Amino acid sequence: MFVDQVQVEVQAGKGGDGMVAFRREKFVPFGGPAGGDGGHGGSIILYVDEGLRTLMDFRYQRHFKASAGGNGQGKQMYGRAAEDRRIAVPAGTTVTDADTGEVLGDLTEPGQTLVVAKGGRGGRGNMHFVSPKNTAPEISENGEPGEHRFIKLELKVLADVGLVGFPSVGKSTLLSVVTQAKPKIAAYQFTTLVPNLGMVQLDDGTDFVMADLPGLIEGASQGVGLGIQFLRHVERTRVLLHLVEMDPDNGREPLDDYDQIRKELGAYDDNILKRPELVVATKMDLPGAAERFADFKAALLARGVAADHIFEISSLTHRGVTPLMHKTAEVLKTAPHFEPEQAAVKTADYKYQPEPALKVTRDSDGTFVLTGDKIERAFKMANLDHEDGAMRFARQLRSMGVDDALRDAGAESGDLVAIDDFTFEFVE
């Protein structure tokens, strides 16, 4: 099964907790703090695997979690850093944040990697909190939570040449003639339901990748038929071979077919119409096809289409196929490469930016609830198992303006205050 679009959940690993420990050694009566730091949590990393062609592997597994870092130990020993979770994707995969729509990256080159969820840093051990006032601190940090997000993976087939046209105009047949690909071929519409790729190898040593794309019909750019589901694959092709059948009995006019496909491509993305295009008249072995082709070619020439960009072929007899492939290779030499989708560029900005506002709300039972990224992160990294750690967290809250915010919200001494799942009493 061909899968080209999927949403997955990624959870990076939490950093390891820092350690509260002291040096205990013979003849060293005041060894001091010796708690080590926690190890970094594992990140979620996507990488391009040349052997993959679809996102099929994500059909049955859509949740990925990296390991947490190891906790710090005594004797200033650091916790072990967790291994990153590496996930293979095919070349041509665009990664976006499912919630914001931000493009995180466009994976097009073999071996290319992208970090989609960063592991949390390890918490610091008590050896970092020594001060002149507290030479034996019982303070440490818990590991930082790893990033969590939902991402959307969208595969756009990477091919040099794309075959476009109405259903059953001979795209799959042409691909099977010029490559070793074995697409499904039958005399009914929408035989091709997935893109098929093949390598064209010419006698002069030139080669290129050709993609047989599912047939388009009127309204495809609005989702009719296979619609946008496969129009996206045209975006990554450098040259288009536009196939138009000359069958006198199909009930359609070749020029109308040509115009309709061009209209749908332009409605989806007008940049596609700027790509080099060769017009290919197919099924020229049928009776009456030559007359239809003569009228069709005359109409194209009148519109300014170059004569050397119009071909007539029969995939059944292989007539005209070799000249078409050589011309395609010639056009490819000067055809521009597609521009990868630009990921949001993350640059360091050292200008002052205020922290997101601390929010104080009140539950129906009278408990004041504190929310905000900074305060929630500080809480998750606070080790409240020791009095020193609890006092440090209280000082952090005060420095963030929590006391003033609670008073402004009407809190009085003795009222309950909640952060996440932790509840404490407000004391003036």
Swiss-Prot record:
Residues in OBG-type G domain copies: 159-333
Main EC class the enzyme belongs to: hydrolase
Q: Which key words are in the record?
A: Cytoplasm, GTP-binding, Hydrolase, Magnesium, Metal-binding, Nucleotide-binding
From the UniProt record, report the name of the gene that encodes this protein.
obg
Organism listed in the record = Lacticaseibacillus casei (strain BL23)
Question: According to its UniProt record, where is this protein located?
Answer: Cytoplasm
- Pfam families linked to this entry: DUF1967 (PF09269), GTP1_OBG (PF01018), MMR_HSR1 (PF01926)
Residues binding Mg(2+) are S172, T192
Assembly notes:
Monomer.
Please give the Gene3D superfamilies that the UniProt record associates with this protein. Answer: GTP-binding protein OBG, C-terminal domain (3.30.300.350), GTP1/OBG domain (2.70.210.12), P-loop containing nucleotide triphosphate hydrolases (3.40.50.300)
Question: What EC number(s) does this enzyme carry?
Answer: 3.6.5.-
Q: Tell me the InterPro entries matching this sequence.
A: G_OBG, GTP-bd, GTP-bd_Obg/CgtA, GTP-bd_prot_GTP1/OBG_C_sf, GTP1-OBG_CS, GTP1_OBG_dom, GTP1_OBG_dom_sf, OBG_GTPase
Listed cofactors: Mg(2+)
Please give the NCBIfam families that the UniProt record associates with this protein: Obg_CgtA, Obg_CgtA_exten, PRK12296.1, PRK12297.1, PRK12299.1
Query: What is the name attached to this protein's record?
Result: GTPase Obg
